[in-house]
Amino acid sequence: MLKSPLFWKMTSLFGAVLLLLIPIMLIRQVIVERADYRSDVEDAIRQSTSGPQKLVGPLIAIPVTELYTVQEEDKTVERKRSFIHFWLPESLMVDGNQNVEERKIGIYTGQVWHSDLTLKADFDVSRLSELNAPNITLGKPFIVISVGDARGIGVVKAPEVNGTALTIEPGTGLEQGGQGVHIPLPEGDWRKQNLKLNMALNLSGTGDLSVVPGGRNSEMTLTSNWPHPSFLGDFLPAKREVSESGFQAHWQSSWFANNLGERFASGNDTGWENFPAFSVAVTTPADQYQLTDRATKYAILLIALTFMAFFVFETLTAQRLHPMQYLLVGLSLVMFYLLLLALSEHTGFTVAWIIASLIGAIMNGIYLQAVLKGWCNSMLFTLALLLLDGVMWGLLNSADSALLLGTSVLVVALAGMMFVTRNIDWYAFSLPKMKASKEVTTDDELRIWK
């Protein structure tokens, strides 16, 4: 077997494929590095503007001082404790209009969104009946609105409670801190009537916009000009419409679904970043780095199909190709991915794919004209390479049926190879070539006499 030309041919082709894995891995490393550079740009934009935003509120914080007694050494001792009671709204309505703009640093872009939010909350005074005990003293209440990054708070219109304009102050007003704003309620017996709050604020950020549905019944409607939303969080929108011009989504929830009534009743717990929320993220669709990385996963398939076509050509014709010629064609296929990555950063992925495919086809067409001794075979292989590039493009753009399409390509390629080689005597290729035997001489030819 070691003397078989077919064995050494297959071994050399397998070795060429293994060698080509090295530049493929290097290109994938370059893709990771370029994607990291893009992530650094997004971080820089986030640091210079504001980060993801999580809106909690409006809710009313009521300082409570409670006197209670305990038994110590056969005597009654009076104790005092202070805590914050959160008065949650019966209904919370959030209506927002979001505008997304792109910020560019070098060749990289990131997104910053600006949302104009209108908040309407109704508070039922009957929820405060538990605070009417004689041993309880109430402090001055204030409305709390918490956000993820206070740098994103823009214009805030004067909020109104029961038609009365109030003053808004920075910070949440809570001892535990937190970023946001608070609105002191006016003096008076506010416990004798229901409260209706109306306010509007401009909130900017990057990445996620989340709103905690703190009302007994909560709804949110958001309209945006960004066509690539990613709906996250604990609640998917009840309704949503996504088009090339943007999206509109509507969420709704209640305490029966999120249990926020009990979680806020825990008092001084302000770990609100873990509370369930309506969420949507402004995300970049599958960018050039993700697409190029996916494309490189099919590189071995492209190289294997090309080598298989060359091998069948050798088998059916008298033309012989050296393993170095296989390797050079394979390198040109690998360079396609590096060229695709470099071009896609400037022209977009689709245009880069077309240009890289044409450049690769021209390179191989000119080279194969000399290798295959003619333009006819060269053009045939060049068109086949362009067809394979088209198949790879189809695989990238059919995520749901990529497995089916890829399997179909392999089945068709294998069936084609089986068909064109069905009459080949492989044993003839496997046998080592025998040296031509010398002519047999007769005794009469060796004689020096007659």
Swiss-Prot record:
GO terms for cellular component: plasma membrane. Keywords: Cell inner membrane, Cell membrane, Membrane, Transmembrane, Transmembrane helix. Residues 1-6, 319-322, 369-378, 422-450 are cytoplasmic. PANTHER family: INNER MEMBRANE PROTEIN CRED. It comes from the Bacteria. The chain crosses the membrane at residues 7-27, 298-318, 323-343, 348-368, 379-399, 401-421. Disulfide bonds: none annotated. It is found in: Cell inner membrane. Mutations of this gene leads to an enhanced transcription of the gene cause tolerance to colicin E2. This is Inner membrane protein CreD. Residues 28-297, 344-347, 400 are periplasmic. It comes from Escherichia coli (strain K12). Its main location: membrane. It is a multi-pass membrane protein.
